[in-house]
Amino acid sequence: MCDDHAMQAISAYGSPISKLAPTPNLDRLAAEGMLFRQAFVENSLSTPSRACLMTGLYSHQNGQRQLAEGIDSTKTFFSELLQGAGYSTAVVGKWHMSCSPKGFDYYHVLDDQGQYYNPTFASTGQYGNFKQEMGY
């Protein structure tokens, strides 16, 4: 799942710029399933949009109306429902919410906007809680 991916960046939609970075796996999913031509988000900012995806709630209900506010971590996350149904769950990338990722078997996330050169990730697994990556 991607919370901040422009339609024109996916080859299946036919945008000329999609040739810069082809998306064959997403294109296959679109060919075998469905292509959304009228999809909308509840909030166009990355963190509030992510909070809406994670909770299924509007921003005013989940507490993450702006970048600087914090999500109400007592709300049930979609990842917790997936775990409860027996799925393995993981999240990798920018988390940027005020709570630790919950409902994930594995995570490797940037806590905040952070620095993108030699970033420090919050992680589960062999590296413990934090691991610094080298480079971009």
Each PLM stretch: what is its role?
Residues 1-136:
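Formylglycine-dependent sulfatase
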